[in-house]
Amino acid sequence: MAYKMHTKSFILHSDFSPSGDQPQAITQLIEGLENGLAHQTLLGVTGSGKTFTIANVIAKLNRPAMVLAPNKTLAAQLYAEMKAFFPENAVEYFVSYYDYYQPEAYVPSSDTFIEKDASINDQIEQMRLSATKSFLERRDTIVVASVSAIYGLGDPDSYLKMMLHLQTGAIINQRQILAQLAELQYTRNDQAFERGTFRVRGEIIDIFPAESDDKAIRIELFDDEIERLSLFDPLTGSSFGPVPRYTIYPKTHYVTPRERILNAIEKIKQELAERRQFLLENNKLLEEQRITQRTQFDIEMMNELGYCSGIENYSRYLSGRNEGEPPPTLFDYMPSDALLIIDESHVTVPQIGGMYRGDRSRKETLVEYGFRLPSALDNRPLRFEEFERLAPQTIYVSATPGPYELEKSGGEIIDQVVRPTGLLDPEIEIRPVAIQVDDLLSEARQRADQNERVLVTTLTKKMAEDLTDYLDEHGIRVRYLHSDIDTVERVEIIRDLRLGEFDVLVGINLLREGLDIPEVSLVAILDADKEGFLRSERSLIQTIGRAARNLKGKAILYADRITNSMQKAITETNRRREKQMKYNEARGIVPQALNKKVGELLDIGQGANQKAKANRNAKKVAEPTALYVVPQTAKEYQQQIKKLEQQMYKYAQDLEFEKAAAVRDQLQQLREHFFEVQ
């Protein structure tokens, strides 16, 4: 059956029109893409509106796009921004759906085999399915993804073949529909109607599609004919009205037609026989017994159920690819004329290059010791050269582009240095190392008195801890951000810094791309003259840029000599600052402070459920007002505390970090009130 794609145009919603360097950057990027340039680099400084520029390019070219981000946090931030720019179009989110993931591994030195263990986030799985569905169905699609996009996914050809097409008036009996749903790995559940399940009541079949979070489809049969199709709310049961046709997508990306599974089983048996012979010839009897037992169990499971635990290790056969060929990934679902935007490319590009090697070494050990067949090596992320081959026209976006991006762009970069707000890059001062701690203490006090914040970056964990203790002893409200802090707590700490719970944040690597704190007026870089990864040109520019969102932004570099990296970072920052000042003077622009609300970060999945958003309480999470009803007795207090704790952990588990932080604040207030009453 030919597949028809919806051709709706992108409609950009914004209260602002492009300004500063944005109009010029948009024009240059569009011209480059229309002239067939495969690679372009956008050098956009912090706060210059890079996302808005990219949104304008996508809207004007009207082409589907994938935006790659280096981590889940930044991907979520970009998803929220793109969702706001394109509320009428398909903006999707595609990141790893594991809350916890322990890959299968073997440690020969201790003869320890570690079974694969994983916890899948149901909401993110739904968003991944929604992302591939949008790429297959709609032209007006933007998928914001992490490097999870280069990992193996189900074969799109098999995925498309397995779809169940429903149409009013079609002749199909109930038994056929139920059999096809079972093939799509949907399960029947007449009690709990959840995502990926269906229920049957007489001649009515209700299906809750795996990629949907708020709409289910009802099939009403009259004998062997589909009499009516209608969408309804699975929670309330209220109808959204009839639809002429509907397509049910498989419950998972890894679903495979029965004939291909049977074909794969024969090839697996053949490989197993060859592997057994090899192991026996090399006197590896234990390994031979192990691989035989494990593989035969998998074959039986696939024969009976159509899948098995770890079925992805047989992806070479299931996708019909030859040895060494790249696995199917999200790139195989993209339309051929899609755009690829790599955000924070100086971090993301090296990440893409590093994924394959780590995965390969772990799997080679499993193969060598008889836990997996050699074909399991083809269940892998893309190699870098394969990624390059598959990537469509690409725009690299970074404040500090790396050598790879510059080489691919032929050394030509598109500058976006002037901010729409007129804000300038921070002033840079160099002060001697000998006075760095006491000088920092003095600067921190001045900033705290003016209700401003300070970021301090050190070289070692010990130095960061000692500095935090020293500042604390001298009355500075200070916190220390270190590598042991998880994502939820990190979001909470940054939120508390913005709210003024403390004034100084100390860390080792605070250049984290996308760390958006307009209240920070001072960045202090200790031991700036120690060459290395944390004091490279890019690291220094990124760290200095953390103060670029404040009217009084300043960076102090404590150093006894000016290193090559320092000189380059200072020269580049001064170049940008000079260009910004000239632009402002020529147009009479007065720099304006950013008033970004603390609550405007992200709620992963909020965009996916507009109804929930509309019904949500209007209060922002940044507001310290408690939303609970004040209990009257000790028992009521304990019940309320327990209830809020459960709610907080649920939000954290769903990656809704800001909601979790808001509930944490409520808990703290409730506990304080309880102790006062006691």
From Swiss-Prot:
- Which parts of the sequence belong to the Helicase ATP-binding domain? 31-417
Instruction: Please tell me where this protein is predominantly located.
Output: cytoplasm
Q: What Gene Ontology cellular-component terms does the record carry?
A: cytoplasm; excinuclease repair complex
Q: Which Pfam families match?
A: Helicase_C, ResIII, UVR, UvrB, UvrB_inter
Q: What does this protein do?
A: The UvrABC repair system catalyzes the recognition and processing of DNA lesions. A damage recognition complex composed of 2 UvrA and 2 UvrB subunits scans DNA for abnormalities. Upon binding of the UvrA(2)B(2) complex to a putative damaged site, the DNA wraps around one UvrB monomer. DNA wrap is dependent on ATP binding by UvrB and probably causes local melting of the DNA helix, facilitating insertion of UvrB beta-hairpin between the DNA strands. Then UvrB probes one DNA strand for the presence of a lesion.
Query: Which family would the database say this protein is a member of?
Result: Belongs to the UvrB family.
> Which protein is depicted?
UvrABC system protein B
UniProt source species: Pasteurella multocida (strain Pm70)
